[in-house]
Amino acid sequence: MSIHPVMQRLAEKINRTDLPAFVPGDTVRVQVKIKEGEKERLQAFEGVVIARKNGAQGSFTVRKISFGQGVERIFPFNSKVIDSVVKVRSSKVRRAKLFYLRGLRGKAARLKEVERS
């Protein structure tokens, strides 16, 4: 099944190329545009990527612990709300989906850091 050429050209215009390559297990800092009334500001959301979905057109899920509560946020790759994504560190994992981290607390939820280029 191939994509219609018109749809393919449209997708190429919409797709973002400024996002770094990251995989589940990487810790990323996502700068999110927040609009409050007339003002617009950037808010950082830093956490572990626990899932990527549907390739280039898809989304990724970031999880962090805030004041003892787990917080997950799903970001579409082509969202206008995302200002930038920075990869902070990489970790060694053997799964594509890290949903098991939801049930772990404290030291058990740590991931082993690894050097990647």
UniProtKB/Swiss-Prot annotation:
Protein's name in the database: Large ribosomal subunit protein bL19
Entry's Gene Ontology cellular component terms: cytosolic large ribosomal subunit
Record-stated family: Belongs to the bacterial ribosomal protein bL19 family.
Pfam families: Ribosomal_L19
A GO biological process held by the record: translation
InterPro entries: Ribosomal_bL19, Ribosomal_bL19_sf, Translation_prot_SH3-like_sf
Keywords: Ribonucleoprotein, Ribosomal protein
Function of the protein: This protein is located at the 30S-50S ribosomal subunit interface and may play a role in the structure and function of the aminoacyl-tRNA binding site.
UniProt key word Cell cycle: no
PANTHER family: LARGE RIBOSOMAL SUBUNIT PROTEIN BL19M, RIBOSOMAL PROTEIN L19
Gene3D superfamilies attached to this UniProt entry: 2.30.30.790
Gene Ontology MF terms in the entry: structural constituent of ribosome
